[in-house]
Amino acid sequence: MGFAADVPPAEVQIAGAILAAPPELREGAAVLGFGAQGTRVELRTGKNEMICLASDPAKATFESDCYHKDLEPFMARGRELLAQKVTGSKRNEVRNKEVEEGKIPMAREPRTLYVLTGSRFEAATGKVQDSYLRWVIYVPFATTQTTGLPTRDRKSVV
């Protein structure tokens, strides 16, 4: 990474990034992508509550993420930790602790993250090859008592 040729033009990054968002929210979504040096930059200012992240051109596969703007402090901290090579459960532990300590603001209401993955983005067609869309619904400060959801996955209790 680091060469301008490695980074797709802003319009291509935007077209791919917004595909993770619900169709009715795509046009007004803010988009964070990559500049010529491979650093994260704002490609488009948002007009609604969605923020979308363009796929990292340094990675072999495609992934775009879109989420409610109230999740941005939490997501930005996750990107900072990844840059520091803090990954997996350790990254989640750090962020969750910082939320509990009030260091990272977190929405009080549920918010959704949309993640679209695939083998590649075809700029000419605007389609993601071998695509898969998943949702993550963040329910901050929820407990088993407030949601009825277990604290462990089913495999660990069956």
Please give the residue ranges for each predicted region.
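Conserved small/polar residues in nucleotide/adenosyl-binding loops
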Residues: 157
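N-terminal secretory signal peptides
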Residues: 3-93
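Pocket-edge structural micro-motifs
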Residues: 33-35, 54, 116-118, 139-141
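Helix N-cap / beta->alpha transition motif
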Residues: 67-68, 138-140
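Short, surface-exposed ligand- or partner-binding patches at beta-edge/loop junctions that are enriched
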Residues: 152
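Mature extracytoplasmic domains of secretory-pathway proteins
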Residues: 61, 69-134
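Substrate-binding/catalytic groove segments of enzymes
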Residues: 144-148
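Extracellular structured ligand-interaction cores
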Residues: 47-49, 132-136
